């Protein structure tokens, strides 16, 4: 079981690296260092990578205890929410006119992402504690 949890933790590290790649690409696009075509390719590759990580984690989950399975379910749900919030945030940033309403929405999404990251880290720590 410890080996399976370690596989999940490594997959989660891969997921974090994919988010970093996405963040770097978004920043490069905003700074006009890469164009929309390159951005589209990167988004597609990151999406495929995230889907693969999620699938791998679900496959590993099958051999875990009930408690660990529940933690994995929670992890996957938090990660899904994080991805949705990330996409919404980037969409808002692209069309933002710096209105007070948009700035409030951006701040709320950034706070949500920070909260989700903490929750994800807590789940990962709980998984480590279970083994």
Swiss-Prot record:
Subcellular location: Cytoplasm; Nucleus
A Gene Ontology biological process term: pericentric heterochromatin formation
Pfam families in the cross-refs: DNA_repr_REX1B (PF14966)
Protein purpose: Required for heterochromatin silencing within pericentromeric repeats and at telomers. Facilitates the recruitment of Clr6 histone deacetylase (HDAC) by interacting with histones. Also interacts with Rad25, which mediates heterochromatin silencing in DNA repeats by recruiting the RITS complex. Together with Rad25, forms a regulatory hub that defines heterochromatin silencing within tandem repeats via linking RNAi and HDAC.
Superkingdom of the source species: Eukaryota
Gene Ontology CC: chromosome, telomeric region; cytosol; nucleus
Name of the protein in question: Heterochromatin silencing protein rss1
Keywords for this protein: Cytoplasm, Nucleus
Leader sequence residues: none
Record's subunit section: Monomer.
InterPro entries per record: REX1-B
């Amino acid at each position: 079981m410890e080996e399976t949890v370690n596989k999940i933790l490594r997959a989660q590290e891969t997921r974090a690296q994919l988010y970093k790649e996405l963040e770097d690409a978004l920043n490069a696009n905003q700074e006009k260092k890469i164009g929309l075509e390159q951005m589209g390719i990167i988004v597609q590759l990151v999406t495929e990578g995230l889907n693969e990580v999620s699938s791998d984690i679900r496959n590993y989950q099958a051999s875990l205890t009930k408690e660990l399975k529940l933690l994995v379910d929670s992890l996957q749900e938090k990660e899904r929410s994080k991805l949705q919030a990330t996409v919404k945030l980037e969409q808002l940033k692209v069309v933002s006119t710096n209105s007070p309403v948009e700035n409030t929405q951006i701040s709320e999404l950034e706070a949500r992402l920070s909260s989700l990251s903490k929750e994800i880290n807590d789940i990962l720590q709980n998984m480590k504690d279970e083994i």
